[in-house]
Amino acid sequence: MKHLGIFYKPELFGKAESLKELLLNEGYIVDYCESSERIKNNKVDLTIVLGGDGTFLKASHLVNNPLVGFKGGRLGFLSSYTVEEFDKFLKDLKNNNFVSDERTFLKVSDLNTFCLNEVLLVKDPDQKMVDIKISFQDGELFFHADGIMLSTPTGSTGYSLSLGGPILLPNTKAFVITPVAPQFLASRSIVIPDNEKVNIEVDKRVNLIIDGVNFGKFSKITVMKSKKKISILRPVDYDFTKSIKEKLGYGKKIL
């Protein structure tokens, strides 16, 4: 990997410039060092992302090459290093000491738009609760709630988890459907195979939010697994369970 790009959260400009200088001194070609969407469709061997999971999500929608993340936010589930580990990264880069953590996207067919984390249909604060119908090959589900979320395994440690959804291992071939503030306590998340095509109908037009971006008002969408994938480079000693123990305290040994 010789041609590299850097995409960074604006607050991390200084860190991005420091990394750029380190890479140039090691003989790498840094094709861009940007915090804007000007990186879109730039062809490099690897895009380095400095920021939180939000910055990483944004980068995943702009480029098609492998990504490696440096944590500059709170949790950083998508990050492989911290912004204090440039030396460790350079050593791994020289020795190609990485494994590929491949992640799949969802596709919202109505918009031809892709999703790495979650698709959310949710009412405005001043709206009443809505009736939601979800249909797929194995049947139908109905919810009276503020909204509904479909999450990928990648998104299962994000907003979906805050709604009470389960954590999915990254290579799980499934996604999670979770109601938002349902009226009935029995309404819980359901995990379905990722080969299902999911049709969602809401009795009112509500906000469609994909990976944190609001696409306007919709009352009906179709969501399915996309052929689009992205490769996240991890150090060979990366351990997902260690990550959730450290960041969430989940499954951590107490005694």
UniProtKB/Swiss-Prot annotation:
Q: Which InterPro entries match?
A: ATP-NAD_kinase_N, ATP-NAD_kinase_PpnK-typ_C, NAD/diacylglycerol_kinase_sf, NADK
Active site positions: 53 (proton acceptor)
Q: Which UniProt keywords apply?
A: ATP-binding, Cytoplasm, Kinase, NAD, NADP, Nucleotide-binding, Transferase
The Gene Ontology biological process terms listed for this entry are: NAD metabolic process; NADP biosynthetic process
* Binding residue positions for NAD(+): 53-54, 58, 117-118, 128, 144, 146, 157-162, 181
Give the reaction(s) catalysed: NAD(+) + ATP = ADP + NADP(+) + H(+)
GO CC, sorted alphabetically, is: cytoplasm
Look up the EC number in the record and give it.
2.7.1.23
Q: Where in the cell is it found?
A: Cytoplasm
Q: Transmembrane residues, as ranges?
A: none
Chief subcellular location equals cytoplasm
Molecular function terms from GO: ATP binding; metal ion binding; NAD binding; NAD+ kinase activity
Domain of life, per lineage: Bacteria
Q: Does the keyword Transferase apply?
A: yes
Cofactor(s) in the UniProt record: a divalent metal cation
Does Cytoplasm count among this protein's keywords? yes
Top EC class for this record: transferase
Q: Which family does it belong to?
A: Belongs to the NAD kinase family.
Protein task:
Involved in the regulation of the intracellular balance of NAD and NADP, and is a key enzyme in the biosynthesis of NADP. Catalyzes specifically the phosphorylation on 2'-hydroxyl of the adenosine moiety of NAD to yield NADP.
Q: What is this protein called?
A: NAD kinase
Q: Which gene encodes it?
A: nadK
